[in-house]
């Protein structure tokens, strides 16, 4: 087996449940300019799975069906996805123009990064961050009341 025969993926690939595979793929491509690994899409009666590339990151989207997957309504809420892009302001303008539900406008964070927050078409929260701006932890300008490190 050669390297070209192997699936290329990062060490961690999050999986997010959705109710409509095709609509979700279209939304990510149109609103966030992400790309599907088309050759890897799987479908089955009532469901499917697709792998989505966001820069060098990879995640998959799942729709429950007859494969024994967990029903989307039973998934615990509270997960936020973070993805890095080259230009937060440009990404924000595009997502907003495409009708994305914006939670917060682009802003500079105490860690040096620039971010905005947005909900996707099914209400999952995404934090879009600008690549190459995050400072080392010892250089963060912490807001009042926030401490660094493990409490003693």
Model-derived segments and spans:
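Vicinal oxygen chelate
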Residues: 1-15, 25-26, 31-86, 90-119, ...
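Short acidic-aromatic low-complexity motifs
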Residues: 18-22
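C-terminal catalytic core of tyrosine-transesterase DNA break-rejoin enzymes
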Residues: 122
């Amino acid at each position: 087996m050669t390297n070209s025969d192997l699936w290329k993926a990062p060490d961690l690939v999050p999986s997010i449940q959705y109710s409509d595979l095709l609509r979700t793929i279209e939304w990510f491509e149109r609103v966030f300019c992400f790309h599907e690994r088309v050759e890897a899409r799987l479908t089955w009666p009532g469901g499917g799975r697709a792998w989505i590339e966001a820069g060098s990151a990879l995640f998959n989207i799942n729709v429950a069906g007859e494969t024994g997957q967990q029903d989307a309504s039973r998934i615990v809420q509270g997960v936020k996805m973070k993805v890095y892009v080259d230009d937060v302001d440009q990404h924000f303008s595009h997502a907003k123009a495409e009708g994305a539900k914006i939670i917060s406008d682009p802003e500079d964070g105490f860690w040096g990064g620039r971010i905005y927050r947005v909900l996707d078409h099914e209400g999952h929260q995404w934090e879009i961050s600008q690549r190459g701006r995050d400072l080392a932890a010892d250089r963060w300008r912490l807001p009042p009341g926030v401490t660094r490190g493990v409490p003693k």
